[in-house]
Amino acid sequence: MSTLTLSNITKSYPNGYQAVHKLSLNIEDGEMVVLVGPSGCGKSTLLRMIAGLEEITSGKLKIDDCLVNNLEPSERDIAMVFQNYALYPHMSVYDNMAYGLRNRKTPKADIQRIVNDTAEMLEIDHLLERKPKELSGGQRQRVAMGRAIVRKPKIFLFDEPLSNLDAKLRVQMRLQIKKLQRRLATTSVYVTHDQVEAMTLADKLVVLNQGTVEQVGTPLEIYDNPASVFVATFIGSPAMNILDAKVTNKGLTLGSSLSPIDTQSLKPGDIKLGLRPEHINIVEKSPWFEVEVELIESLGADLLLYCKTLDCKEMDETDQNLVVRAEGHSKIEIGDILGLDIDQKHLHLFDADTSKHIEIDLKMNDQKELLYA
């Protein structure tokens, strides 16, 4: 088990494009760290630099206290699991898993014990004689994981390993990866663009955007306290609603609607209001504003109401849209006009220019009685 330290890591290409810019990160011994972000944010490039598959332009990469910038991949004691499995098609499952151990001249009896124990842990011990073409996608991924596990590396790297699996298999494999990582207690770095995958797997979540770190924290810390509009809208499904508002001498306004927030600690001007769908309450008489329901998605236990605001138009004179989560059996129909109230503990304000979170102590009037519990 090992620590991983990245100090001002930069990756630049000859054409001037900078995939990663002065990125610093500390990964503790036994920690599962998930790098999440949209395509092109630099997460896979960063993982490849850790593995030694990409050259680091500048900065320092240390495993424990050892600088590894110039070490070959084989010298770093790292195992990597890819999304395409990378299994040898002519070899059996057993031989695929044993391949690295044989190259390291591990005694035959030890190879047999290690492979059998790992296969049993992964629940693929009944597949050891099969070839990859005879396996399902989930089984192939478990073989790829087994091949990495038998090496007992200092660090595991996962590069979107579940991307090729269907939705049901992804859920199953997420659970298995999490259980395995806890059991093995091996330092792990996992790359994904799927924020649900990131939230469920991570001990520490690193949100990347355009080659830089937007925020680092536990999944709940990032969900409850996003540092920017980017993080707020990337983490969470459905995404956080972001509404344009203004701070005036009368208070916080959305168009011509005056909110019940005490804004004495805010500077006058434009501001962005962040509201998660599950933190919006439907009430008989709204202290905030009303919306019209334009679309309803039923998820069984919940309804997702896609709404447009009424009388909340901003400078461009267009309606603002937001999503509200309601109880699954609520009697709500398209075209209904609903009053909304906000759970003050979960209200977020962002600077209109920088999109960064504004830390203030919000004070509001009492919540109104809920119409739809």
UniProtKB/Swiss-Prot annotation:
SMART domains: AAA. Part of the ABC transporter complex UgpBAEC involved in sn-glycerol-3-phosphate (G3P) import. Responsible for energy coupling to the transport system. This is sn-glycerol-3-phosphate import ATP-binding protein UgpC. GO terms for molecular function: ABC-type glycerol-3-phosphate transporter activity; ATP binding; ATP hydrolysis activity. It is an enzyme of class 7 (translocase). It comes from Psychromonas ingrahamii (strain DSM 17664 / CCUG 51855 / 37). The keyword Heme does not apply. It is found in: Cell inner membrane. The gene is ugpC.
